[in-house]
């Protein structure tokens, strides 16, 4: 409830039409969010231009990340362990666990080959190996692969995926945020100039209201495909036989109007870019953070981190919490949703979209600055009595609700306050390992990163007392067995003496027997 109050106080009530950023896709290629992933977006650039006047400028850029992706495989490795705890004071106790293990390139290539040949096989947990008075581990090194496609940066040819360290990778083998997982592909990428270029509506901001001020301090530019960015330090750079400009954040665009382009190109303060310059696509953090108010930035970050903290600690989250994770500016970024109690994502390009209100009867919106009305989304998942889509958007009987934008309008209802517990993606072998456990009433637990049995001598004694019932029964069994054994030995001795023939005493007068003495 505190997060609702903070956000309501921080923003002005939104009445009527609203402008948001929304994924360009209408459905997602969903994947589970990795455990170490912790993305928080930059604050919205809505007021970054302050009182500057906007001048419409038609731009062109390489086509967005709508179709460009490359196929590959995630290679997962784990140590599957069966632990036998057969201490002298207790009964035999068996546990199963899996542990992170970094795969080798050779292991992964062999696993990928087996997968393609249709002969991949998971043997499961190794058989137990028990020795009296010991704790023994039986180990199996298991490597599996799963198909996993990633997006492609049209400018650099780099692979883009939240699993990669830093979100990007170049090459046929990529490290991931999981130390037990690598990504493999046989693709060399595509030629960056094979992309189609698309027109985008842009606005140049300046106090002087003149295009000739481009490149000077206190000027900036934004479009439906990227957030407000300062034009100070802009330089001229050709790309794929097209004359264009590179901003200081390495974003490239071309001005379509020949007269405007010539005016800007002839400005003396706009120089040619260095020959070694590189360019990138609008990324997840493209906003110039120095232009965003500290209060808004800190508040957005705190609300986002609060959501990740809830997920990490297993606390329930609401659609409003989930909406804090979504990007606030146009460009490439992750889309989040909840599927079967797990947090999922996919990567899309965000566009500026205008909505009639935070609750709409049809899932449609108008691309900002145009007359184009488009279907926004068409994939929903169960969430209590309603359905949930991207970044907390809800499909209800009353219409489609955008929780983040309902806050502060007086329309807050029970739908956007529904809570559900969601989980990270811990290790891909966990789900498979569950199928190898017993399905009886023993309630066997699968341990991750720990065998569930301590080998520390002090903790062994503590374990004796923590499991005192089973340990006591084991000790009593040993004592009773020892007593029974002693009784049997004594009984055998008694019976032996009873059935042994008695020796007749020999007297000296017995001449015949005395002869043998």
From Swiss-Prot:
Protein name: Glycoprotein
Residues listed as glycosylation sites in the UniProt record: 179, 340
Annotated site residue numbers, Involved in the interaction with host LDL receptor: 63, 374
Biological source species: Vesicular stomatitis New Jersey virus (strain Ogden subtype Concan)
Miscellaneous notes: The Ogden glycoprotein is missing the basolateral targeting signal in the cytoplasmic domain, therefore this protein should not be targeted correctly to the neurons dendrites as the other VSV G. Palmitoylation site is also missing on this domain.
KW Glycosyltransferase (keyword) present: no
GO biological process, any: entry receptor-mediated virion attachment to host cell
Function: Attaches the virus to host LDL receptors, inducing clathrin-dependent endocytosis of the virion. In the endosome, the acidic pH induces conformational changes in the glycoprotein trimer, which trigger fusion between virus and endosomal membrane.
Lineage, top ranks: Viruses, Riboviria, Orthornavirae, Negarnaviricota, Haploviricotina
Disulphide-bonded residues: 40-304, 75-108, 84-130, 169-174, 193-240, 235-273
Subunit structure, as described in the record: Homotrimer. Interacts with host LDL at target cell surface.
């Amino acid at each position: 409830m505190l997060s609702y109050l903070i956000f309501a106080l921080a923003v002005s009530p939104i009445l009527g039409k609203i402008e948001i950023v929304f994924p360009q896709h209408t459905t997602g290629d969903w994947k589970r969010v990795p455990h170490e992933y912790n993305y928080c977006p930059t604050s919205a650039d809505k007021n970054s231009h302050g009182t500057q006047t906007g001048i419409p400028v038609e731009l062109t850029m390489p086509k967005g990340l709508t179709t460009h992706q490359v196929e590959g495989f995630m290679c997962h490795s784990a140590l599957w362990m069966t632990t036998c705890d057969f201490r002298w004071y207790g009964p035999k106790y068996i546990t199963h666990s899996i542990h992170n293990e970094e795969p080798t390139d050779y292991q992964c290539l062999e696993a990928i080959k087996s997968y393609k040949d249709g002969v991949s096989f998971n043997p499961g947990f190794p058989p137990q190996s028990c020795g009296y008075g010991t704790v023994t581990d039986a180990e199996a090194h298991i490597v599996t692969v799963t198909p996993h496609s990633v997006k492609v940066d049209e400018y650099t040819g780099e692979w883009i995926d939240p699993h990669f360290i830093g979100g990007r990778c170049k090459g046929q083998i990529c490290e991931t945020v999981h130390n037990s997982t690598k990504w493999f592909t046989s693709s060399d990428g595509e030629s960056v100039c094979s992309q189609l270029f698309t027109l985008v509506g842009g606005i140049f901001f300046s106090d002087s209201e003149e295009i000739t001020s481009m490149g000077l301090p206190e000027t900036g530019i934004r479009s439906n495909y990227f957030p407000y960015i300062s034009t100070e330090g802009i330089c001229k750079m050709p790309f794929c036989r097209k004359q264009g400009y590179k901003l200081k954040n390495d974003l490239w665009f071309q001005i379509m109007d020949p007269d405007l382009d010539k005016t800007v190109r002839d400005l003396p303060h706009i120089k040619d870019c260095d020959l070694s310059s590189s360019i990138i696509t609008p990324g997840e953090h493209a906003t110039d953070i120095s232009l965003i108010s500290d209060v808004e930035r800190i508040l957005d970050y705190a609300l986002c981190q609060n959501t990740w903290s809830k997920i990490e600690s297993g606390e329930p989250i609401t659609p409003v919490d989930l909406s804090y994770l979504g990007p606030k500016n146009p460009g490439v970024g992750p889309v989040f949703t909840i599927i079967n109690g797990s947090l999922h994502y996919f990567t899309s390009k965000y566009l500026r979209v205008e909505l009639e209100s935070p609750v709409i009867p049809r899932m449609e919106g108008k691309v900002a600055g145009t007359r184009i009305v488009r279907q926004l989304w068409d994939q929903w998942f169960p969430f209590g009595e309603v359905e949930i889509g991207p970044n907390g958007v809800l499909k209800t009987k009353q219409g489609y609700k955008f929780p983040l934008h309902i806050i502060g309008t007086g329309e807050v209802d029970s739908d956007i306050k529904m809570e559900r517990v969601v989980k990270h993606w811990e290790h891909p072998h966990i789900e498979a390992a569950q199928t190898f456990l017993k399905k009886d009433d023993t309630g066997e637990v699968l341990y991750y990163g720990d065998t569930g049995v301590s080998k520390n001598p002090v903790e062994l004694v503590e374990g004796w007392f923590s499991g005192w019932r089973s340990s006591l029964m084991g000790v009593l069994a040993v004592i009773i067995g020892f007593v029974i054994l002693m009784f049997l030995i004594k009984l055998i001795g008694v019976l032996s003496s009873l059935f042994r023939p008695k020796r007749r005493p020999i007297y000296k007068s017995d001449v015949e027997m005395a002869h043998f003495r």
